[in-house]
């Protein structure tokens, strides 16, 4: 049975969906004012794997990942570049789609944008005003009054006073309490705005997600996810405003992905220590990046380094070597139940991908020993749930080399073939040994000599 670590209760719990066989999942997406960095990729890959696994277990998953396309940062960046907000957001939405496609991240079933749900947001704010959980401040903003929600802090597990310091709280002097947060911002000159019962303005960040989640999944759903940095105040505020409006629990399970770090610090644009997905893709195969991101449990911090990416590449090479000579899978190919069960046990333990990867390596060892097509197909199928081992093995094993390097290898193979034809076995063996020392393995066959990279 699947067990998930629920941030709300701080413990692993058996997963029971609200509707048998169906799962509603909402994950906070990006704010589109810049290129996605590898920290964004970690969160997207983590939830992508969760969705893939849940579907492999027969669940009908409705996966929603939003786009924040109106925000202070977006407005500021558009102004800096002297472009329209629509032009700016379109640019970075396209870039995000290119990144996710390259990383084999499945598109969500629904990808709502904040600007497409203004009426939904306004209706939710009206409910909060009617219930006495919100107020119109002196400057025309509509704010949520935290003191009206006694359970505030139940997600971050901190007392109210402790939450005030060191948080992403927007300081507005018209607030009744420092923790009160803006639901609707009064329009400012030159900024985009929409009509509302409280005058022209635009939605605050937190209310957008509550409104879009409830629009797509209903007032209650199963899983809400995002990066650990969103736990407070964003997710805490989502709970407060959603549950105050409906009187029901918002999401049953809260899952948070640990931070990607560089030298012990969170990778972030605000710090300037980030690597964009596009830049990392220039240097590393997409499946290598996926493997690296899954090498640590999703809740644990993960350190970015070239050494860790190199280790991921070596690991994938070993897996691809195990399946390189496997005949194509047929419709009646059956998967090995024992290894399926071992893999499922790992994933049922709060999506424990490091243990799942160790299962794949044990299975690869058995494939190498037995050369069993059934085991090899099982390996490819299970790895596919993690989103890799889906390329042509020969193509992958030759990837990552410059054309000049490939040309040198082909020239050496030609020299070796000539030496063999001349029965100069010493020279032929020396060329093979030299290439092997550089991580290139030759294989002689009826149609000629082929080569591939191997794990060094």
Swiss-Prot record:
Binding note for cofactor: Binds 1 zinc ion per subunit.
Compartmental location: Cytoplasm
Uppermost EC category: ligase
Residues annotated for ATP binding in this entry: 269
Cofactor(s) the record lists: Zn(2+)
Family of the protein in this entry: Belongs to the class-I aminoacyl-tRNA synthetase family.
HAMAP family recorded: Cys_tRNA_synth
Subunit structure of this chain's protein: Monomer.
UniProt name for this protein: Cysteine--tRNA ligase
Organism name: Legionella pneumophila (strain Lens)
Lineage of origin: Bacteria, Pseudomonadati, Pseudomonadota, Gammaproteobacteria, Legionellales
